């Protein structure tokens, strides 16, 4: 074999072998245990970044490991290729989104191949192709027929100048990104899928996700947000009107001093007809984007409507206020306000001089609401017939009374809202609904699917081409004129079922149930924790929809989930003449000085600018601290990049990019290459004969098999790839120091190397493939089996025992592995060093920890 490790040469040869032999293409095989390994597919932005490389390296390590376990492994890849960035790029580059997207796919596909990922490319999908989205459209029509799809008005960001809807990302400081016009909120009809119909099942089934991180499960539980409470009816004084309020704290009902309703509530709009101040407030609320996230931090404002609500139990009248912290699309659009026991209500009451009444007091201690509300549960007082009850007692008594009087009901509510899937954008899958001439809205007939998105378009940056082109919407259904829906699907739709399409990507149906049920559920899913509450919830929801449509048998889409951490890099900037920060790539920093703790104290870039170092932060375009994987692959080779990615940090934690660490990984591979090269150059004809081994040879062989056991557990069960690599590195140190003078010396090195290249194969497959062949194996490493631990090699002939006298180590003795306590005591007491410390004292106690420690207590 060649003496020098040449990554570009061997990686090209090995990748050609995989391509020519279709090594990673798989079909269903009832005789083999399957393993479906999937990393979240990328958006084709143009170039891979290190976050991609980390995600896909982890996936490839798991897939290759499982392959060597003898399993039938599916590892597919594709492209999440619809979305707003393509529209923006098309506008900037004066092209259409389609060619930009397809060009990026080709470029990134080659980058993935350069990194040596073992994908089944025959299953590649791109979600922007009609072959893919036709089945999404078909499924949507089936959901509509089942009553799981409906249309209602919902608020969107509206630019009055361009007369177009803006995505949240296109609103900058409350203004349109393009023309700087203040953005308004506008109610327009949109399509929704009833995810709330599955809220209880989605919540309960979280308990079955044993292989998912607790953090993700907690985030989903909170997002679904199940609560038990009471919905009650308040009358409106002086009218026959009434409205409903839901609360999880009916124990505080007797402390209500006002009611807050959303600006868009029918009662607010009614009162505004004779209240100009309220009308103005409602307009202001309409034009402010209020998400749930904003509610906690924004200033709480309100206007009295002049209306009064009638308390459902006491009959007392309390004022109704319109408030900006109540959302019409959340709950009933009205909340009962108990300032004595809710901090937000307390602050609002203080601001507007509204009464504050206490009705709950601590079980022990004094009640004090002079500075803040008392929000804990306690005992009721000032509550009439309910005085003295605790939370549970009051909940039941008040709920029972409201139910008995027909003024309320017990209710389970969910924080989860139905999924709004309409987007007023162009680059997405058209929603397959049509409006007939008489106004009836129906699904696009199956024989007219797919509704194809035209790709040869001109982007003007203002309106979606399919909205601007009035002819596109015109169609016919059963001989009647009709208009197509011009909204497109939320791109979370495509990523909610792609994993299932991989099972039968060429099928002339949404899924081939036989193939889908062979591969599903996914055995290992890998992606970022930032997807916990959106993609990963829709992913689970869609799987249940597919199940209920008879397309899959399982309840959940993925058995195990690994959420990899972010990749961080150093960030540097200087301030230019205009006072703006100019971020400099770490690759352009030529000089750095560090203090004795390794902190950067001075940095200069290639143009001589003195830089400010801001520390390690997430690789991003904005801070110009992204490292191009391709540059690193060209410099060090794909295996080095992969090895660094796996060794530098546990997979769930952040990874700090350090080129010195990459260089270290490269040196390790060169050491492995040299050890193999030196071994191959010798006469290795003598077979291993365990009966002939010396104690030193047995000890080395023991290290080999201990390493096999540790790496198998680290990769297979613990998924701690960094400690697996560390274990192999430690073994390599032993192997490099070991003699290769006798035939048995070399036989052990040979056994060790054939194990090491398989242990490292998932991580550095090109090197492992090549060395496997150079070591004389006739089969391909992909067809080999994972190394098996020889349990007999782990058995030790002798043990090293530490001997302590009065808690201090005085000697180390070697005893037979099966020596009993009496023998060990005798040897320990006879040791010269121990005798010295026992002279003239009486042994009071001897403690023996088998195989490890002999402790003597004497005085």
UniProtKB/Swiss-Prot annotation:
<keyword id="KW-0648">Protein biosynthesis</keyword>
<dbReference type="Pfam" id="PF00133">
    <property type="entry name" value="tRNA-synt_1"/>
</dbReference>
<dbReference type="InterPro" id="IPR014729">
    <property type="entry name" value="Rossmann-like_a/b/a_fold"/>
</dbReference>
<comment type="similarity">
    <text>Belongs to the class-I aminoacyl-tRNA synthetase family.</text>
</comment>
<dbReference type="GO" id="GO:0004823">
    <property type="term" value="F:leucine-tRNA ligase activity"/>
</dbReference>
<dbReference type="InterPro" id="IPR015413">
    <property type="entry name" value="Methionyl/Leucyl_tRNA_Synth"/>
</dbReference>
<keyword id="KW-0436">Ligase</keyword>
<dbReference type="GO" id="GO:0005829">
    <property type="term" value="C:cytosol"/>
</dbReference>
<dbReference type="InterPro" id="IPR002300">
    <property type="entry name" value="aa-tRNA-synth_Ia"/>
</dbReference>
<dbReference type="InterPro" id="IPR009080">
    <property type="entry name" value="tRNAsynth_Ia_anticodon-bd"/>
</dbReference>
<dbReference type="InterPro" id="IPR002302">
    <property type="entry name" value="Leu-tRNA-ligase"/>
</dbReference>
<keyword id="KW-0547">Nucleotide-binding</keyword>
<keyword id="KW-0963">Cytoplasm</keyword>
<keyword id="KW-0067">ATP-binding</keyword>
<dbReference type="GO" id="GO:0002161">
    <property type="term" value="F:aminoacyl-tRNA deacylase activity"/>
</dbReference>
<dbReference type="Pfam" id="PF09334">
    <property type="entry name" value="tRNA-synt_1g"/>
</dbReference>
<keyword id="KW-0030">Aminoacyl-tRNA synthetase</keyword>
<feature type="short sequence motif" description="'KMSKS' region">
    <location>
        <begin position="618"/>
        <end position="622"/>
    </location>
</feature>
<protein>
    <recommendedName>
        <fullName>Leucine--tRNA ligase</fullName>
        <ecNumber>6.1.1.4</ecNumber>
    </recommendedName>
</protein>
<feature type="binding site">
    <location>
        <position position="621"/>
    </location>
    <ligand>
        <name>ATP</name>
    </ligand>
</feature>
<dbReference type="InterPro" id="IPR025709">
    <property type="entry name" value="Leu_tRNA-synth_edit"/>
</dbReference>
<dbReference type="GO" id="GO:0006429">
    <property type="term" value="P:leucyl-tRNA aminoacylation"/>
</dbReference>
<dbReference type="InterPro" id="IPR001412">
    <property type="entry name" value="aa-tRNA-synth_I_CS"/>
</dbReference>
<dbReference type="InterPro" id="IPR009008">
    <property type="entry name" value="Val/Leu/Ile-tRNA-synth_edit"/>
</dbReference>
<feature type="short sequence motif" description="'HIGH' region">
    <location>
        <begin position="42"/>
        <end position="52"/>
    </location>
</feature>
<dbReference type="Pfam" id="PF08264">
    <property type="entry name" value="Anticodon_1"/>
</dbReference>
<dbReference type="Pfam" id="PF13603">
    <property type="entry name" value="tRNA-synt_1_2"/>
</dbReference>
<dbReference type="InterPro" id="IPR013155">
    <property type="entry name" value="M/V/L/I-tRNA-synth_anticd-bd"/>
</dbReference>
<dbReference type="GO" id="GO:0005524">
    <property type="term" value="F:ATP binding"/>
</dbReference>
């Amino acid at each position: 074999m060649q003496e020098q490790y040449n990554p570009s040469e061997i990686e090209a040869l090995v990748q050609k072998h995989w391509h020519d032999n279709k090594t990673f293409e798989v079909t269903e095989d009832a005789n083999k245990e399957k393993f479906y390994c999937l990393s979240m597919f990328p958006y084709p932005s143009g170039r891979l970044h290190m976050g991609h490389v980390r995600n896909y390296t982890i996936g490839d390590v798991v897939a290759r490991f499982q392959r060597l376990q003898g399993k039938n492994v599916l590892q597919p890849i594709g492209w999440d290729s619809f979305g707003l960035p393509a529209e923006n790029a098309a506008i900037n580059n004066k092209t259409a989104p389609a060619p930009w997207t397809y060009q990026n796919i080709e470029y990134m596909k080659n980058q993935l191949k350069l990194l040596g990922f073992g994908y089944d490319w025959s299953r590649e999908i791109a979600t922007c192709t009609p072959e893919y989205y036709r089945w999404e459209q078909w499924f949507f029509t089936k959901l509509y027929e089942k009553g799981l799809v409906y249309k209602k008005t919902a608020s969107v960001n509206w630019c009055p100048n361009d007369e177009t809807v803006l995505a949240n990302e296109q609103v900058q400081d409350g203004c349109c990104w393009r023309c700087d016009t203040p953005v308004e909120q506008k109610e327009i009809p949109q399509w929704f899928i009833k995810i709330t119909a599955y809220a209880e099942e989605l919540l309960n089934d979280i308990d079955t996700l044993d292989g998912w991180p607790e953090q993700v499960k907690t985030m989903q539980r909170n997002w679904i947000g199940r609560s038990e409470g009471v919905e009650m009816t308040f009358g409106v004084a002086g009218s026959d009107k009434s409205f409903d309020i839901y609360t999880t704290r009916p124990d505080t009902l007797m402390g209500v001093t006002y009611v807050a309703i959303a600006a868009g509530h029918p009662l607010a709009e009614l009162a505004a007809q004779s209240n100009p101040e309220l009308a103005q407030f409602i307009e202001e609320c309409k034009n402010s984007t209020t998400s749930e996230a904003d509610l906690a931090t924004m200033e709480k404002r309100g206007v009295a409507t002049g209306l009064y609500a009638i308390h459902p139990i006491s009959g007392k009248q309390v004022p109704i206020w319109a408030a900006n912290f109540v959302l019409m699309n959340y709950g009933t659009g009205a909340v009962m306000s108990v300032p004595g026991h809710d901090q937000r209500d307390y602050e609002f009451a203080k601001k507007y001089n509204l009464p504050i009444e206490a009705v709950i007091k601590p079980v022990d201690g004094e009640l004090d609401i002079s500075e803040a509300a008392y929000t804990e549960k306690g005992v009721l007082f000032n509550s009439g017939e309910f005085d003295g009850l605790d939370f549970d007692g009051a909940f039941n008594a008040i709920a029972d009374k409201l139910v008995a009087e027909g003024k309320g009901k017990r209710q389970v509510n969910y924080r989860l809202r139905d999924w709004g899937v309409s987007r007023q954008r162009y680059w997405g899958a058209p929603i397959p609904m049509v409006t007939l001439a008489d106004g009836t809205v129906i699904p696009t007939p199956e024989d007219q699917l797919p509704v194809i998105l035209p790709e040869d378009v001109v982007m003007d940056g203002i309106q979606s081409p399919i909205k601007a082109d009035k002819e596109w919407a015109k169609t016919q259904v059963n001989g009647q004129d009709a208009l197509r829906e011009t909204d497109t699907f939320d791109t979370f739709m495509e990523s909610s079922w792609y994993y299932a399409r991989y099972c039968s990507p060429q099928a002339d149906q949404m899924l081939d149930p036989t193939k889908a049920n062979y591969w599903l559920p996914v055995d290992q899913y890998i992606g970022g924790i930032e997807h916990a509450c959106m993609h990963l919830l829709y992913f689970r929801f869609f799987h249940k929809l597919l199940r209920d449509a008879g397309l899959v048998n399982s309840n959940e889409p993925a058995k195990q989930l690994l959420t990899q951490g972010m990749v961080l890099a150093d960030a540097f900037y200087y301030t230019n003449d205009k006072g703006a920060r100019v971020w400099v790539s770490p690759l352009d920093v030529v000089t750095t000085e560090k203090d004795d703790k390794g902190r950067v104290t001075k940095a200069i870039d290639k143009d001589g600018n003195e830089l400010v170092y801001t520390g390690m932060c997430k690789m991003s375009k904005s801070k110009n601290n992204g490292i191009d994987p391709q540059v690193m692959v060209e410099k060090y080779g794909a295996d080095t990049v992969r090895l660094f990615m796996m060794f530098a940090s546990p997979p769930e934690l952040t990874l700090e990019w350090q080129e010195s660490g990459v260089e270290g990984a490269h040196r390790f591979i060169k050491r492995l290459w040299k050890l193999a090269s030196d071994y191959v150059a010798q006469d290795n004809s003598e077979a291993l004969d365990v009966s002939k081994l010396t104690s030193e040879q047995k000890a080395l062989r023991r290290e080999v098999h201990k390493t096999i056991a540790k790496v198998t557990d680290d990769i297979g069960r613990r998924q701690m790839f960094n400690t697996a690599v560390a274990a192999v590195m430690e073994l390599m140190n032993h192997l490099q120091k070991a003699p290769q003078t006798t035939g048995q010396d070399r036989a052990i090195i040979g056994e060790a190397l054939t194990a090491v290249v398989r242990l490292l194969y998932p991580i550095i497959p090109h090197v492992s493939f090549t060395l496997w062949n150079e070591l004389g194996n006739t089969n391909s490493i992909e067809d080999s089996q994972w190394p098996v631990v020889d349990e007999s090699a782990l058995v030790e002939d002798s043990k090293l025992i530490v001997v302590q006298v009065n808690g201090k180590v005085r000697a180390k003795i070697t005893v037979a592995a099966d020596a009993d306590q009496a023998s060990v005591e005798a040897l320990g007491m006879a040791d010269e060093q121990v005798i010295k410390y026992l002279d003239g004292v009486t042994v009071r106690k001897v403690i023996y920890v088998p195989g490890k420690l002999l402790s003597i207590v004497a005085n």
